[in-house]
Amino acid sequence: MKPSIVTFLMLAAVTAAVSAEDPTMSALKSRVEEIAGQVHGVEDQETTPDLSHCVEPKLCCGSLTTPLDPILDPILLSLGINAAQIVGSVGLLCHPWTEECSSAPQCCTEANLLGGTLALGCSKL
C-alpha cells in the first residue's frame, strides 16, 4: 500500500507539532537563565513552611528571590502572573532535589514553570 499525500501531510503536521517548542516560552526560559545571577537573593526565612502545601518534588533552586524583584517582574507579567499575589519567594533554575544539591530543598507551593526554571511560592526547608 502506497502512502497518500494526505498521510504524508498528516505525518508532517504531527512531527512539526511535537518537535516545535513555543518560541515565547523558550525566550522566557532563556531570560530567567540570564538573570539568575543578577537577582537579589532572599535571606533565610524565619518561618517554617506548611509542608502539606508543598508541591512534589522538593526542588533544588539555583537562587531564591523576592517576587517583586524588578529584574524578574517583566517575566512574571509575560506569564500572566501578578507578583504582588505570590506568597513566598521565587525559585530560579530549579530541578528536583537530590543529595548532590548544594542547597537545602525548597518547598514550592504554587507553581513550577518553564520546565522547572521558575518556581513560585518557595521557601527553604
Swiss-Prot record:
GO terms for cellular component: extracellular region; fungal-type cell wall. CDD domains: hydrophobin_I. It is found in: Secreted; Secreted, Cell wall. Residues 1-20 form the signal peptide. Disulfide bonds join C54-C107, C60-C101, C61-C94, C108-C122. Keywords: Cell wall, Disulfide bond, Secreted, Signal. InterPro entries: Hydrophobin. Induction: No expression is detected in sporulating cultures, nor in vegetative cultures or during infection. One of its GO terms (molecular function) is structural constituent of cell wall. Aerial growth, conidiation, and dispersal of filamentous fungi in the environment rely upon a capability of their secreting small amphipathic proteins called hydrophobins (HPBs) with low sequence identity. Class I can self-assemble into an outermost layer of rodlet bundles on aerial cell surfaces, conferring cellular hydrophobicity that supports fungal growth, development and dispersal; whereas Class II form highly ordered films at water-air interfaces through intermolecular interactions but contribute nothing to the rodlet structure. Self-assembles to form functional amyloid fibrils called rodlets. Self-assembly into fibrillar rodlets occurs spontaneously at hydrophobic:hydrophilic interfaces and the rodlets further associate laterally to form amphipathic monolayers. RodG contains a signal peptide and the conserved Cys-pattern. RodG shows a class I hydrophobicity pattern, but an unusually short C5-C6 region for class I or class II hydrophobins and unusually long C3-C4 region for a class II hydrophobin. Belongs to the fungal hydrophobin family. This is Class III hydrophobin G.
